[in-house]
């Protein structure tokens, strides 16, 4: 049995000092009774909770259910709705002005193609054109290289029909396309 140590702080008030002295004497008496050879009730922490009868000890159920009830089961039942919402309340919730779709005032026309788009956002139609042209260029590069890991470590230049390589294009990989350069694809 490990030795225990109790630290007492003596309060300055005489009434509290007397109460503390009485408690200390009772504790000493109980500790002396609990020595080996004396029978005493087991010491240990105890928890006393006042609650509804739902939390009392479960009765022996012989119906064969192996499921034990717990505190969480009753908490989940407490969180269930008790009354049905009226149709008026539901309508107010559904038609709340904060839940309605907000009108967008940042819609503009694309200067290239004329389709509607959001301001400061690339037009979806123009983006699709760029994506298709880029996919064609990548497909042609794949045919020219012969594999995904055989790419040279030089810069790539795309030349369309009727264009010739300039002095800056010397030593670069040149991809030639057999069509006219699109207006949105600049040469530099």
Curated annotation (Swiss-Prot):
Single GO term (MF): metal ion binding
Post-translational modification: MRPL32 precursor is processed by the m-AAA protease (composed of AFG3L2 and SPG7), which cleaves the N-terminal transit peptide. Cleavage by the m-AAA protease takes place prior to assembly into the large subunit, an essential step for mitochondrial ribosome (mitoribosome) assembly. Proper processing by the m-AAA protease is dependent on the zinc-binding region within the tightly folded C-terminal domain of MRPL32: zinc-dependent folding halts degradation initiated from the N-terminus and triggers the release of mature MRPL32.
SUPFAM superfamilies found in the cross-reference section: Zn-binding ribosomal proteins (SSF57829)
Positions bound to Zn(2+): 110, 113, 123, 126
Cleavable signal peptide: none
GO biological process: translation
Sorted UniProt keywords: Metal-binding, Mitochondrion, Ribonucleoprotein, Ribosomal protein, Transit peptide, Zinc
Region (Disordered): 162-188
Localization of this protein: Mitochondrion
Domain of life the protein comes from: Eukaryota
Compositionally skewed regions (Basic and acidic residues) per UniProt: 165-181
Main location: mitochondrion
CC annotations in GO: mitochondrial inner membrane; mitochondrial large ribosomal subunit
Entry-linked Pfam families: Ribosomal_L32p (PF01783)
Record's function text: Component of the mitochondrial large ribosomal subunit (mt-LSU). The mitochondrial ribosome (mitoribosome) is a large ribonucleoprotein complex responsible for the synthesis of proteins inside mitochondria.
Assembly, per entry: Component of the mitochondrial ribosome large subunit (39S) which comprises a 16S rRNA and about 50 distinct proteins.
Family designation: Belongs to the bacterial ribosomal protein bL32 family.
Listed NCBIfam families: rpmF_bact (TIGR01031)
PANTHER family documented for this protein: 39S RIBOSOMAL PROTEIN L32, MITOCHONDRIAL (PTHR21026), LARGE RIBOSOMAL SUBUNIT PROTEIN BL32M (PTHR21026:SF2)
Protein name from the UniProt record: Large ribosomal subunit protein bL32m
Organism of derivation: Bos taurus (Bovine)
Lineage: Eukaryota, Metazoa, Chordata, Craniata, Vertebrata
Gene that specifies this protein: MRPL32
């Amino acid at each position: 049995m490990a030795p225990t140590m109790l630290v007492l702080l003596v309060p300055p008030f005489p009434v509290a000092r007397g109460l503390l002295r009485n408690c200390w004497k009772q504790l000493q008496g109980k500790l002396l009774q609990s020595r080996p050879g004396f029978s005493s009730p087991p010491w240990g922490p105890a928890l006393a909770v006042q609650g509804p009868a739902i939390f009392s000890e479960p009765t022996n159920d012989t119906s064969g259910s192996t499921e034990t009830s717990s505190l969480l089961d009753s908490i989940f039942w407490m969180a269930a709705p008790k009354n049905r919402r009226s149709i008026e309340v539901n309508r107010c919730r559904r038609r709340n002005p904060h839940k309605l779709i907000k009108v967008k005032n940042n819609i503009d026309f694309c200067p290239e193609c004329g389709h509607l788009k959001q301001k400061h956002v690339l037009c979806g139609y123009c983006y699709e054109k760029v994506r298709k042209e880029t996919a064609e260029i990548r497909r042609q590069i794949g045919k020219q290289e012969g594999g995904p890991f055989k790419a040279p470590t030089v810069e790539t230049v795309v030349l369309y029909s009727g264009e010739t390589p300039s002095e800056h294009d010397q030593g670069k990989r040149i991809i030639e396309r057999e069509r006219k350069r699109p207006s949105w694809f600049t040469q530099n």
